[in-house]
Amino acid sequence: MLAKRIIPCLDVDNGRVVKGVQFVDIKDAGDPVEVAKRYNEQGADEITFLDITATNDERDTTYHTVERMAETVFVPLTVGGGVRKIADIRNLLNAGADKVAINSAAVFTPEFVGEASQKFGNQCIVVAIDAKRVADIEVDGIIMPRWEIFTHGGRKPTGIDAVAWASKMAELGAGELLVTSMDGDGTKKGYDLALMKQITSRVNVPVIASGGVGNLQHLAEGVLEGGVDAVLAASIFHFGEYTVQEAKAYMAAQGIQMRL
């Protein structure tokens, strides 16, 4: 069985790591290269760097920051934000990214995901899904939750069902899915386990849970109840509540296979 992964996430805005609540109410959390270096030293399995306003501002992710980070960090680095064309992916990989996350562009041009995965290999293509719970639906007399995809850093609704979308992205060639619950983001109430279960039961690619971690138990729940392959967190690490080592030790104590 593959070891589960802990992935600290750096949301970057104007060259600084920030953390918000439900995609707003932003707080500064430091210089991205310094923050990444700290997590590298703590034993993070991977690091994710998301330029959270790149798509909305229609500008490219800062390659210079990625280059500096890649020189400092010796674990796989996933970079996303403003990725709209094949050249963007090539430039990020050349700058030192190991994987590239596609979000809004996948919604507008789904075939872009297939093209990217054919050109670079699906192991380095991550599709990021920002999902928000909307009105429940009735299926065969049972009330079921429904989640909708949002784009542009969670600013624009699409009307697309998130669970069906996750399946489509896996079929098109995504090597991994990064699923963020917008309802949970920054709330510290735990992952949306129902959303994670719905997606992990339908796809055969690794799923990363994101949005809502407030304690170490939430990380373990993502794996044990949500069925995910990796857990992503930000504020519990950024503001010193826990270290990555503490998180790994806790998860291992719950019987989860970890790289210690």
From Swiss-Prot:
GO MF, one example: lyase activity
Record EC number: 4.3.2.10
GO-annotated cellular components: cytoplasm
CDD domains assigned: HisF
Coiled coil regions in record: none
Highest taxon in the source lineage: Bacteria
One GO biological process term: L-histidine biosynthetic process
Active site: D11, D130
Pfam families: His_biosynth
Similarity comment text for this entry: Belongs to the HisA/HisF family.
Purpose of the protein: IGPS catalyzes the conversion of PRFAR and glutamine to IGP, AICAR and glutamate. The HisF subunit catalyzes the cyclization activity that produces IGP and AICAR from PRFAR using the ammonia provided by the HisH subunit.
PANTHER family: IMIDAZOLE GLYCEROL PHOSPHATE SYNTHASE HISHF, IMIDAZOLE GLYCEROL PHOSPHATE SYNTHASE SUBUNIT HISF/H IGP SYNTHASE SUBUNIT HISF/H
Name of this chain's protein: Imidazole glycerol phosphate synthase subunit HisF
Taxonomic source organism: Psychrobacter cryohalolentis (strain ATCC BAA-1226 / DSM 17306 / VKM B-2378 / K5)
Gene encoding the protein: hisF
